[in-house]
A protein has these predicted regions:
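Acidic, glycine-rich loop-and-beta core segments that form the ion-binding/anion-interacting portion
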Residues: 137-187
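Nucleotide/phosphate-binding catalytic cleft detector across ATP-hydrolyzing
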Residues: 1-144, 163-165, 174
Length: 187
């Protein structure tokens, strides 16, 4: 019904959408891979080896991975936020992050939109879309936490060095805060 109204008002037929996925009951997984480079110059081959030795490509039982990426690189305890190729070192670490939501929830939404002949082009975690809409490039580069306070939940997105590093949501929203304030005033 809402989509029909939107199509009527815009005088276009809605064929596809980008769909926000709430982060409540989501899963964040941090992992790491380490390889020895024995004083050699780091190349893309070393990076591929470190990625292949990790759980980066593994799926999560009952969860759909929405975002996965390398947070940073570590060469002999020095952190790099960009590709460390052409540097020399002994130990190369890659730090990974995966964000996932329950697979059944995602499948239900996909089926719902397929049933009304609307293609979902991309599933976007709600905290990420809120952050991209509100943070500028300086915020993301310097480091920022974007908290979107909703009625019954709040979503969180963290950026550092222009890189997303964490997404989550908690089941505390403005309704909870309002009730707490009212309770505090009444006593």
């Amino acid at each position: 019904l809402v989509l029909n109204e939107a199509a009527k008002e815009s005088q276009t037929k809605i064929k596809s959408i980008n769909l926000n996925i709430p982060a409540v009951d989501s899963l964040s997984v941090f992992s790491k891979s380490e390889i020895q480079v024995a004083g050699e110059m780091i190349t893309d081959l070393h990076l591929k080896k470190a990625i292949n030795n990790s759980d980066f490509f593994e799926s999560l039982t009952d969860y759909e991975v929405m975002q996965k990426f390398i947070i940073n690189y570590n060469v002999d305890d020095k952190i790099y936020y960009t590709n460390p190729s052409n540097n020399f070192g002994n130990i190369l670490n890659l730090n990974f992050y995966k964000f996932a939501v329950k697979k059944n929830y995602v499948n239900t939404l996909i089926k719902l939109f397929n049933d009304i002949n609307i293609n979902i082009e991309e599933l976007i975690p709600t905290p990420l879309s809120s952050a991209l809409a509100t943070l500028n490039s300086d915020d993301k580069n310097l480091g920022a936490i974007c908290i979107d306070l909703g009625d019954s939940s709040s979503s969180i997105a963290m950026f550092e060095n222009n890189q997303l590093i964490f997404l989550d949501a908690i089941k505390v929203g403005s309704k909870n805060i309002t009730h707490d304030i009212a309770r505090g005033i009444s006593t």
